[in-house]
């Protein structure tokens, strides 16, 4: 038996998320991967993902692992998977890892990107790959607000209703914004040990409202203190969110 760590990218638009839904007719990234790897192994294979991205969310660097019944070289796994996967999923890298490696539980940090299109009208070529926000924005206000997210906090106000995690305490280690005026785009980068369901999309929604002037610049501090999801209001669309990279202690 051999454990494989596989880095993949995918266009999330036509998927109902990464995780198997156990619902007739649903299409998920995990289902497509299981189908292909199980066919290669000639037996049902369990596929574990580092992040359970939501419907419409994309990935540049999702990591999965699976234990294969026999040892093949990395190129054979990569070529075998890419020759059978649908064209909206791509295997980028395959590595042999110890049997106890788990793509989800072995990770210690994740990086997500969020793309915002600020064009007056929705660009037909960006509509599935950015969140659209056409209201006026003062990006200096957003830049001033971003450091308020850094550190270990109770992010209850930034968790989707119905969140069932054992704790809402998370650590954000990076929160940055790059501006691309020629493309009418903003690019947010967030890194942390883990994120709550919809946390990044809610954080982006709050930051955009700060930039628009409908919230005070340091309203994030208040939201963290009051622990009230209803006060955070706007959730940015799934289309702008990308899982960019997953980090592992022994493989950085």
Curated annotation (Swiss-Prot):
Q: Which reaction does it catalyse?
A: uridine(38/39/40) in tRNA = pseudouridine(38/39/40) in tRNA
Q: Which domain of life is it from?
A: Bacteria
Q: GO molecular function, one example?
A: tRNA pseudouridine(38-40) synthase activity
Q: Is Protein biosynthesis a UniProt keyword of this protein?
A: no
- The top EC class, named as a word, is isomerase
Pfam families for the chain: PseudoU_synth_1
Q: Name one GO biological process term.
A: tRNA pseudouridine synthesis
* Gene3D superfamilies per record: Pseudouridine synthase I, catalytic domain, C-terminal subdomain, Pseudouridine synthase I, catalytic domain, N-terminal subdomain
Q: Which residues catalyse the reaction? A: 54
List residues binding substrate. 112
- What InterPro entries has UniProt attached to this entry? PsdUridine_synth_cat_dom_sf, PsdUridine_synth_TruA, PsdUridine_synth_TruA_a/b_dom, PsdUridine_synth_TruA_C, TruA/RsuA/RluB/E/F_N
Q: How does it assemble?
A: Homodimer.
HAMAP family in UniProt: TruA (MF_00171)
- Report the function annotation for this chain: Formation of pseudouridine at positions 38, 39 and 40 in the anticodon stem and loop of transfer RNAs.
Write out the similarity annotation.
Belongs to the tRNA pseudouridine synthase TruA family.
By what name is this protein known? tRNA pseudouridine synthase A
Q: Which organism is it from?
A: Oenococcus oeni (strain ATCC BAA-331 / PSU-1)
Its lineage opens with:
Bacteria, Bacillati, Bacillota, Bacilli, Lactobacillales
